[in-house]
Amino acid sequence: MPPTEPILLTAAEARVLGALVEKEVTTPDYYPLSLNALVNACNQRSNREPVMDLDEDAVRQALHGLEDLHLAGRAHADGRVTKYEHLLGEAFNFSRAETALFCVLLLRGPQTPGELRGRTERMHRFDEIGEVLAGLQKLMEREPPLVAVLPRQPGTKESRYAHLLSGTVEALHAADSDSSTHREAVPIAGSDAGHEERIAQLETAFVELQQEMAALRKKIDDLFGE
């Protein structure tokens, strides 16, 4: 059942939630995520703005906050390593298009429809900008609203959209205006978005391989230690 009261996430909680949603779609073979894999997903340099440097304690604390809000939890698994999953579907019943848009807004902050179209390509393909706008409109019409359009900045042609799980429109606009003085506009092409996602997949696969090797070494040590 969708929440009836506004949700306010910390920056770390928003990053953890976005990373879990992204990895479920882009690297399903490695989802749900272990704590170590989730830390790497949060801190990866591709498809993240800003790039963060969260440690395990910060991610663990963010997970506790998301669990209290029923937005994430521990996955039921037979393995020794605890893994985590998001509960966004249970909370909001998003369509695939809405999930992709909301996820990228969580991971990269305020963006134009054109930027969102390019950056969601690996999660959901939007054939035209009109489909992006339609998805954003549905998120804006939720009660309470989950997305808002920010006032257009001076000298820009397109408005930017932001999710509302981290504050009000006024607060987000102030933060967006401040950060715009330090941000260069970089065109996002579909091929660039795909390249970023392939890098992210390799990063996740490498972490999982390290965990499997560590588990194998432990089994060998236990065997010869008996």
Predicted regions and their residues:
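N-terminal intrinsically disordered, low-complexity, charged/polar
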Residues: 1-19, 217, 222-225
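Positively charged, polyanion-binding regions of nucleic-acid-associated proteins
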Residues: 10-29, 93-110, 136, 141-142
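Residues in the recognition helix of alpha-helical DNA-binding motifs
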Residues: 19, 62, 135, 164
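Short acidic, hydrophobic short linear motifs in intrinsically disordered regions
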Residues: 27-53, 110-126
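A short, conserved structural fragment
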Residues: 60-63, 67-77, 136-153
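Short, amphipathic alpha-helical interaction segments positioned at domain boundaries
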Residues: 78-82, 86-115, 159-194
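Helical coiled-coil/dimerization "stalks"
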Residues: 119, 151-158, 162-165, 211-226
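Amphipathic alpha-helical oligomerization/assembly segments
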Residues: 185-205, 210-224
